[in-house]
Amino acid sequence: HERFFQSPMLEATFGGGEANVAVSLANYGMDAEFLTILPQNDIADACIRELRYFGVGTKKIVRGEGRMGIYYLEGGANQLPSKVVYDRAYSSIALAKPGDIDWDKAFEGVDWFHITGITPAISESAMELSLESVKEAKKRNITVSCDLNYRKNLWKYGKKASEVMREMAK
């Protein structure tokens, strides 16, 4: 249980709130499609391959500018708590804004849409896109579920989580 940079190695895996839900659903034999905006680079390509490996559909992923968002997890041990460092600035989803997703295409054949409180916490424009996604889903009579997934260290752009999540839950 080494602390950050006590080891010369970092282990890289793909994950994230909504992606983890999609993988879990696919593991239970349910159809799951992942909707997000990813950069056009080899790391994003590897992420897409990983989702496909677990049976998650990726045809609704939009490719855009920016980079992959990263978080670093330092596992805790005994009295030392776990620690997470988020590096989401300039990621594709942090740069995403309303209008970047074709909702007719994204929600075609969809009857359930799941979102977490992590995406709207990343940036103000990602928050606006998140609110747009929920409104567009409801407009199409798609069931919306939301895991608040509060991450204090992500809410840095001036809006409070309680304010935004209340709006998403309407």
PLM ranges: what are they?
Residues H1-R3:
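Positively charged, low-complexity intrinsically disordered leader regions
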Residues F5-G15:
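Short pre-catalytic strand/loop immediately N-terminal to key active-site residues, enriched for Gly-Thr
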Residues F14-E18, I43:
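Conserved donor sugar-nucleotide recognition element shared by glycan-biosynthetic enzymes
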Residues N20-D31:
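Alpha-helix C-terminal capping segments
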Residues G29, G55, K139-N141:
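Glycine-centered short loops/turns at secondary-structure junctions
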Residues D31-G117:
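Conserved N-terminal subdomain of the carbohydrate kinase-like
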Residues W112, I118-K170:
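Conserved beta-alpha-beta core of the PfkB/ribokinase-like small-molecule kinase fold
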